[in-house]
Amino acid sequence: MLLRCIQAENRKLRRSVIWILFLAVPAISAVYGTFNYNMNLGILKNGWYDLWTQYTLFYALFFFAPLIGVYASYLWRLEHLGHNWNLIMTAPVHPFCLFLAKYCVVAKMALLTQGWMLLLFLLGGRFGAGLEGFPPPEIITWLLRGAVGSLAIIALQLLLSLVIRSFALPILLALGGSIVGLLAASKNIGLLWPYALMILGMNSNKTEDVMAGSLIGFFISCLAFTAGFLLLANLILAKRDVKT
C-alpha cells in the first residue's frame, strides 16, 4: 500500500513547475558562488575547498530548507483543496501511510537536489573558476551528510504543511528556521535545532570539517528529530476526523 501511495505522490511531480525551482535555486547559488570566488582570489587560496565555502554560503544557510518547504507544501496542496481531506479520512488507506509516502518522495527530491548541486559544483569549479582536477572526496561526504541532515527538516516541513493550509507560510517558517539554525550552529548548539543539522552536515561555509569527532551526536540528533516529527504527525492524523 505504501508503494502505491508513493507512486501516486510521484505522479503529482510530472510536468510540475516544481522542477523549475529544483533547477533554478541551486543554480543561483552556483552562479553566485563562482562569481564570489573569482572576485576574492587574492584571499581564497585553497581551491576546491574555498569554492565550497562560497557555494554553500547561501545554498545551505538560506535556500535549501525553504526549497524543502516548497516540495512539502506542493505535495500537500491537493489535500487542502475543497473536501479532499474527507476523502482521505474515509479511504481504505491509513492517513499516516500517505504521510510516509510524501516523506519518501520529498527525501528523493532532496537527494536529487544534492546530486544536482554536486554537478553544478564540478562544472563551476572546472569551467567557471578554472580549478584543475576534481573536487576532493570530502565534498561528496558533506553532500551526503547534508542529505541525512535534511531528513529531520523534511519531516518537520511535511508536518507544518499538514497542519497549515497556507502554501507559503511553511516556506517562510523554513527560512526563519534556517536563520535560527545559522545562529545555533555558530554557537555550537546546532545539534539541538533541526534546521541546523543540514548546515552542519554540509560543512557549510567551512574548509575544515566542523563535524570531526561529533558524527555520532549528529546522527543521533537527526534520528531523534525525524522520529519525533513522524510520531507527532501520526498522532495528529490519528485524531483528525472528517470535516463537514
Q: Where are the model-predicted features located?
A:
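Membrane-helix interface segments
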Residues: V17-W19, G82, H94-F96, L100, ...
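Terminal transmembrane helical anchor/hairpin motif
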Residues: Y32-W52, I171, L175-T244
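Transmembrane helix-loop junction
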Residues: L78, A91, L122-R126, L162, ...
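Secretory targeting signals
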Residues: P26-I68, L100-F167, S204-F219
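Cytoplasmic juxtamembrane interface segments
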Residues: M1-Q7, W76-M89, A147-P170
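Aromatic- and glycine-rich beta-strand/loop motifs that create alpha-glucan
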Residues: M1-P26
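Helix-loop-helix units of permease transmembrane domains in multi-pass membrane transporters
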Residues: Y74-A107
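Pore- or pathway-lining transmembrane helices of multi-pass membrane proteins that form conduits
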Residues: L21-P26, I164-L182
